[in-house]
């Protein structure tokens, strides 16, 4: 069995899989990681043969997490890192290792599903990222913006007369008729404009309408803005399969 772990900015996700299927999946906030992870994985500790990790956390956090895993199994976790290229996909960053590994793994999975077609990959979480890939497998770069929660909190904390709590009903980019709507609709309008600009760029240069893939903790929230978008909740895990060459069934 293989334990896959996605160490994000705000949340921790994990799954245990064998050659046939996922056996257990879970996620939690970092503040709950110790109790949630141990409760979920303790029955599988002696059965796990590999631990594969995608982390955007600091080295200190990674070390602390490895110590936590040491209570479960003596195995040494294997960390994925961003690459210049893999499986026909070319990293568009001038310094490929600077691309977040979660973005790289999700791009690998997206490219594996949509080879020969351009696509946009949106990850909606603490940060919102949008990456562009053309029909030849060239990553053209991307955009990084505040996620919805960060955007709402930034506006509320910076303006004394604005006190808004995040809403998950994000489906309208028209002018807001209340402060709450004005803040949320502004985010929706900016995100819609970013996607439209990227859509036009990829369509013009590739001759095909690009696919929009949406992942991340707020994927279901932003999906309401883009009816053509495809929600893909486990792209990072699928990318780990590609990175560690597990697609042929060598899953432990």
From Swiss-Prot:
Q: Where in the cell is it found?
A: Cytoplasm
Which InterPro entries does its entry note? ATPase_NBD, Type_III_PanK
Q: What does the cofactor field's note say?
A: A monovalent cation. Ammonium or potassium.
List positions binding ATP.
6-13, 126
Determine if Transcription regulation is one of this entry's keywords: no
Q: Which GO terms describe its molecular function?
A: ATP binding; pantothenate kinase activity
| Residues at which substrate binds | 93, 100-103, 179
* Pathway where it operates: Cofactor biosynthesis; coenzyme A biosynthesis; CoA from (R)-pantothenate: step 1/5
Family matches, as CDD domains: ASKHA_NBD_PanK-III (cd24015)
Signal sequence span is none
Does this entry carry the keyword Transferase?
yes
Its catalytic activity? (R)-pantothenate + ATP = (R)-4'-phosphopantothenate + ADP + H(+)
Principal location listed in the UniProt entry? cytoplasm
GO terms for biological process? coenzyme A biosynthetic process
Q: Where is the active site?
A: 102
Keywords from UniProt, A to Z, are: ATP-binding, Coenzyme A biosynthesis, Cytoplasm, Kinase, Nucleotide-binding, Potassium, Transferase
Q: Which Gene Ontology cellular component annotation is one that this UniProt entry carries?
A: cytoplasm
The EC designation for this entry is 2.7.1.33
The protein's required cofactor(s) are namely: NH4(+); K(+)
Which PANTHER family did the record assign?
Answer: TYPE III PANTOTHENATE KINASE
State the family it belongs to. Belongs to the type III pantothenate kinase family.
Query: What functional role does this protein have?
Result: Catalyzes the phosphorylation of pantothenate (Pan), the first step in CoA biosynthesis.
Q: What is this protein called?
A: Type III pantothenate kinase
Species for this entry: Cellvibrio japonicus (strain Ueda107)
